[in-house]
């Protein structure tokens, strides 16, 4: 960053003092006297990115190294010459890649098939597929979060050097993630009714009706994010945050 600003004739972004602190921090991360950040001169807030000297891997901070996915299926079938049936049950869990928050999908499905054949020239078929999707994640649209993580400066700290509940700074996306929650519950049912008449061998007359309905419930909860100033006072973070609203 300094080299770029120098090339376009502007003053350095990082002072030499900050660069020296960065080098010390690399040797002794968060060691004594190296909190990664200090208060501004008025002690009313924390210094900005140009004065911080941490070494944060934001991808490692927010993302898991791996995610769990598992599926379970059970089916039964049977019948006679006149009636046959099939019932299949399934469950799938897919964990997301975000590490700090709930980020998952639960999927349940029931698939049933029935056939009734009263005689050689007539048969009835009924198929029904019900699916329930349960999604839990911080935001309806996660793209803004992924964008913000990718552009976070590595020299900025994840926490301010004050113990307590509100020690996440305003530039850490986790502050906002911890105060939002989105859930989507969606049930879908697709049904097919069919009747087949065979007046002559090789000649099938088929009547079919398909019905589908979807019911979806979305819920978005948002709380007030708070952070702590250097003097220990709690501050409400009220500035609008892009993407942290419904529908996203």
Language model region names:
Residues 1, 69-71, 84:
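A beta-strand signature from Gram-negative outer-membrane beta-barrel systems
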Residues 1-55, 92, 96-190, 206-208, ...:
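Surface-exposed loop/interface segments of Gram-negative outer-membrane beta-barrel transport/assembly proteins
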Residues 57-59:
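N-terminal entry motif of extracellular EGF-like repeats
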Residues 69, 80-81, 117-121, 198-202:
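Outer-membrane beta-barrel channels and translocator barrels
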Residues 74-80, 112-116, 191-197:
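Residues on the lipid-exposed face of transmembrane beta-strands in outer-membrane beta-barrel proteins
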């Amino acid at each position: 960053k300094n080299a770029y600003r120098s090339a376009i004739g502007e003053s350095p972004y990082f002072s030499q003092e900050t660069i020296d602190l960065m080098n010390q921090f690399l040797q002794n991360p968060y060691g004594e006297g190296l909190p990664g950040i200090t208060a501004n001169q008025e002690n009313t807030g924390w210094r900005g990115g140009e004065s911080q000297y941490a070494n944060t891997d934001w991808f490692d901070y927010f993302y898991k190294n791996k995610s769990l996915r598992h599926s379970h299926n059970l089916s039964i079938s049977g019948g006679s010459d006149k009636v046959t049936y099939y019932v299949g049950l399934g469950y799938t869990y897919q964990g997301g890649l975000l590490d700090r928050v709930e980020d998952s999908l639960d999927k349940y499905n029931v698939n049933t098939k029935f056939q009734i054949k009263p005689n050689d020239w007539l048969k009835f078929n009924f198929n029904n597929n019900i699916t329930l999707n349960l999604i839990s994640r911080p935001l309806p649209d996660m793209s803004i979060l992924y964008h913000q993580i990718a552009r976070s400066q590595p020299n900025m700290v994840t926490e301010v050097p004050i113990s307590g509940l509100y020690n996440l700074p305003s530039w850490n996306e986790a502050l906002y993630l911890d105060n939002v929650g989105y859930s989507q519950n969606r049930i879908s049912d697709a049904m097919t009714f069919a009747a087949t008449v065979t007046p002559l061998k090789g000649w099938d007359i088929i009547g079919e009706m398909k019905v589908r309905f979807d019911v979806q419930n979305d819920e978005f909860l948002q709380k007030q994010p708070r952070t702590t100033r250097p003097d220990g006072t709690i501050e409400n973070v009220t500035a609008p945050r892009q993407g942290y609203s419904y529908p996203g």
